[in-house]
């Protein structure tokens, strides 16, 4: 059997790229995967998602009766469920500064979930041309806090501002484009890969939210690596977190745990002599960052299983 990379799934057909010949083929899934040997760094037990072929999967296939059949999925190093992608090197997290308006709450929630997945993140802030200079300067000052643990870029895709500085990050990487609906992911991809034939859509003025442009995850060759364009989404949940573990996915909080009286057992909420709260008072932690942490704690506690 031969190895291939899954580029796209559409109407029951998998578009795969043979790793040796680099030829793109149309294939179908075998009725029941013959050899399921999936293990990821994120889990040990099998789940229903193990039986779903994802964009980014490395698969074994063979020709049978004039049809290419995917027989098995090779081990994944990581995976996401929404978007449904596997074997990711990094996530390019795109936010617009306006239309839709930027939310620190959404940024912190995305970062929290991706930190749990142990994925490298690059932040991209789009539509910088739609902000007044003073407002843009204020946003830059607020967002500068995140520079100590994230790489990020400011861009204007339509005028191609900041695009050249961004291109190098894609080399030899599988990069997922992710972010809220309508932030400009498809516009950015169209600038990077003009022949991707994507349809960009205007923001719905009445709802203040974007219309979905990308219907299925798809992997594109670019600059020696691959870019995965994914459907936009605006709802994220914290069902994989517990009140006890949430704090462990804040790298900026972990810097101050050594100053907590209760050490790693501190929840950084009501406890006295808390190093994180002291850092907050001293201006070392962004107030909105801590406030969002408290909101997430409450959200998790109010989930049915808790």
Swiss-Prot record:
UniProt entry keywords in alphabetical sequence: Cytoplasm, GTP-binding, Hydrolase, Metal-binding, Nucleotide-binding, Ribosome biogenesis, RNA-binding, rRNA-binding, Zinc
UniProt-listed InterPro entries: G_CP_dom, P-loop_NTPase, Ribosome_biogen_GTPase_RsgA, RsgA_GTPase_dom
Name of the featured protein: Small ribosomal subunit biogenesis GTPase RsgA
Assembly description: Monomer. Associates with 30S ribosomal subunit, binds 16S rRNA.
Role description: One of several proteins that assist in the late maturation steps of the functional core of the 30S ribosomal subunit. Helps release RbfA from mature subunits. May play a role in the assembly of ribosomal proteins into the subunit. Circularly permuted GTPase that catalyzes slow GTP hydrolysis, GTPase activity is stimulated by the 30S ribosomal subunit.
Signal peptide location: none
Annotated residues for binding of GTP: 126-129, 179-187
Enzyme Commission (EC) number: 3.6.1.-
Needed co-factor(s): Zn(2+)
Annotated GO CC locations: cytoplasm
Disulphide bridges: none
Cofactor info, note text: Binds 1 zinc ion per subunit.
Pfam families named in the record: RsgA_GTPase
Example GO BP: ribosomal small subunit biogenesis
Domain CP-type G: 77-236
GO molecular function list: GTP binding; GTPase activity; metal ion binding; rRNA binding
Main location per the UniProt record: cytoplasm
Cell compartment(s), UniProt: Cytoplasm
List of residues binding Zn(2+): 260, 266, 268, 274
Family that this chain belongs to: Belongs to the TRAFAC class YlqF/YawG GTPase family. RsgA subfamily.
Matches recorded under Gene3D superfamilies: P-loop containing nucleotide triphosphate hydrolases, Probable gtpase engc, domain 3
Highest rank taxon of the organism: Bacteria
Organism whose genome encodes this protein: Aster yellows witches'-broom phytoplasma (strain AYWB)
């Amino acid at each position: 059997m031969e190895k291939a990379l899954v580029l796209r799934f559409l109407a029951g057909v998998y578009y795969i790229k043979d790793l040796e010949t680099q030829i793109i083929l149309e294939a179908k899934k075998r009725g029941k995967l013959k050899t399921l040997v999936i293990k990821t760094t994120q889990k040990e037990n099998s789940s229903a998602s193990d039986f779903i072929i994802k964009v980014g999967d490395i698969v074994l296939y063979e020709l049978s009766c004039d049809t290419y059949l995917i027989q098995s999925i090779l081990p994944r190093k990581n995976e996401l469920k929404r978007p449904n992608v596997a074997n990711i090197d990094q996530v390019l997290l795109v936010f617009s500064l306006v239309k839709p308006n930027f939310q620190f709450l959404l940024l912190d929630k995305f970062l929290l979930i991706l930190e749990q997945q142990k994925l490298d993140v690059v932040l991209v802030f789009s539509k910088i041309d739609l902000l007044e200079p003073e407002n843009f300067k204020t946003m830059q000052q607020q967002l500068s806090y995140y520079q100590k643990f994230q790489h990020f870029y400011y861009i204007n895709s339509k005028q191609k501002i900041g695009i050249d500085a961004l291109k190098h990050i894609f080399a030899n990487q599988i990069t997922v484009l992710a972010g809220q609906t309508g932030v400009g992911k498809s516009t950015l991809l169209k600038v990077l890969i003009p022949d991707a034939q994507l349809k960009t859509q205007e923001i719905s003025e009445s709802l203040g939210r974007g219309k979905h442009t990308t219907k299925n995850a798809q992997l594109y060759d670019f600059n020696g690596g691959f870019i995965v364009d994914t459907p936009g989404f605006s709802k994220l949940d914290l069902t994989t977190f517990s009140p006890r573990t949430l704090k462990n996915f804040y790298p900026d909080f972990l810097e101050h745990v050594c100053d907590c009286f209760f050490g790693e057992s501190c929840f950084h909420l009501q406890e006295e002599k808390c190093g994180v709260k002291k850092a907050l008072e001293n201006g070392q932690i962004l107030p909105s960052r801590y406030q969002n942490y408290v909101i997430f704690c409450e959200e998790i506690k109010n989930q049915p299983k808790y």
